[in-house]
Amino acid sequence: MSTIEQTTTEVSTSGLSRRHFIQAAAATGIAIPFAQMIGGSSIGAAGKVFRYASQAQEGPAAPWMTKGGSLGILNAVGSWLIDVAPSGELKPSVATAWKGTNGGTTWTFTIRTDVKFHDGSALTADDVVYTVNSHLDPKNKSQSAAKLGGGVTCVKVDAKTVRFDLQKPNANFPYNVSSSNYGLLLMKNGVKGDESWIATMNGTGKWIMVSHKLNEKTVFKRNANYFDEAQIPSFETMEQIQYVSQSAAIPALKTGKLDSIHLLYGNEADTLPKTKFYKTLVPTCGGLHMHMRADIGQLTDKRVREAIALTLDRTAYIKGVLGGYALVANDSVMDSFPTADKSVPQRKKDIARAKALLAEAGVKNGFKLTLQSWKRDDIDKFTAFVKSSCKEIGIDVTVDLDGSDGGGARWYAYSVYPSVKGSKVANKGEWLASEFGIAEWAGRPVPDEYLNREWKSTGDWNPHYLDAPDLDAAVDAWLTALTPAKKKAASSLIQKASLKYTPIIVVYNETRVTVTSNKVKGVEFNQQGANWTSGTNA
């Protein structure tokens, strides 16, 4: 095993699981950004149909445009070079093998020759190269381009081989082209990945789209010609039904109109009878990220940002609101990974210190502040928690939530994209243009996307606009580290810089809870919310 391969195994595959779920506006919805939403049901069509709850969509189910809620759809119809298992391990998919050379700056992938698109045409190395380059082309404005990293090129070596050349070494690069980069499902050469793609959804996945109605229901039929026979679903039809809240989805599960609900609150799941339903848990590094603008507004002083963080009783929130189904986080995205520096002190509620920090910053009597996001169950609860917590130090928080489906009307309108360092964009009530806001992030098998896109000053999804060279340097150290020891050293630097500047508050890392009818067996989800196993009727 090469150094790069060993590093990937030791560091990456042992990690806990970006963005967009927990239980989304589908509070109970499944966010499945992977390639295998399968399972079984004795409900409907004599046990031939599997129905599951999904979150509301924030945008179209198109490769270049994919956002929360649409990910499950892409997951059903698409396939990737590599899959990510529930353990975080990389598993062969369209690529049967991959290897890093040249110190982690070159990655070569061997491609299967038996993969077919839903229209019957064969997938080739040319299709793989086209898919990658279509995302990298700036005119396509792909939401997934930044996940590949800067300075990446992809070329065809021969009919069975493609090669990626990187400007900087990256031991975790295979994750960038895996199912965790959900928009990068393989497309047919020349086909656009914009909204026009939705008409046919011509992918290579195990499900074929039959019908799709935005934010209502998508129906799929089994792909009997899927290249991995062992993974062909046992059910003929799958229905993804989108719900606005878990209170709507739970009754449907109880009455047999749904077979499974993913991303429930644990205490909600606990109310369901064990004689009829079973519960599965997956710890992740996902959850809600609350950003504070460091460039304009009332939160530019890091002492004020720290003061807000010190008002939050993390343990009490996890126990009282989340029913214990989460782990305490320490305002960084590194805390859940095995590379984390456990000696970094855990931030705890300290009202006296918070008040002192406000006094030092010249606002001892507090001020008025607006917290913005979009309306869904977990965000409703969390914003109430933040509002009451901040009140203890004199900060009067007004909560402003976008009530549109998936937050697409305003919060995730993306009129501001990408984030631009030094732009000082005005507050528009959007994720990337708000002084104080909350975005939901699904878990990732490695933290690279969080770091490169959300935390780094040059990130395209940087909502805080902090310009901190030492934090940037720590992120770069992580991204280029090729040994576990160097990864751990870089993680320590990131954790400490995150506490020093507090651009984002991360209170908890969620445990994803799934409840499934006992009439179905073998339903298992990975850390991002993808259904990994091929379930059957019990």
Predicted regions: what is each one?
Residues 53-102, 133, 202:
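N-terminal lobe/hinge region of extracytoplasmic solute-binding protein
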Residues 398-409, 422-427, 440-442, 448-518, ...:
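Extracytoplasmic/peripheral linker and loop segments enriched in polar/acidic and small residues
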Residues 85-89, 178-233, 237, 245-247, ...:
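Gly/Pro-rich hinge or "lid" segments in bacterial periplasmic/extracellular proteins
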Residues 327-360, 375-381:
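Structural transition elements
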Residues 1-16, 27-30:
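N-terminal secretory signal peptides
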Residues 514-538:
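Long beta-strand-rich cores associated with HINT superfamily self-processing modules
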Residues 195, 225-271, 396, 405:
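Ligand-site clamp/hinge motif
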Residues 110, 144-188, 211-213:
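Surface-exposed binding/hinge segments that line
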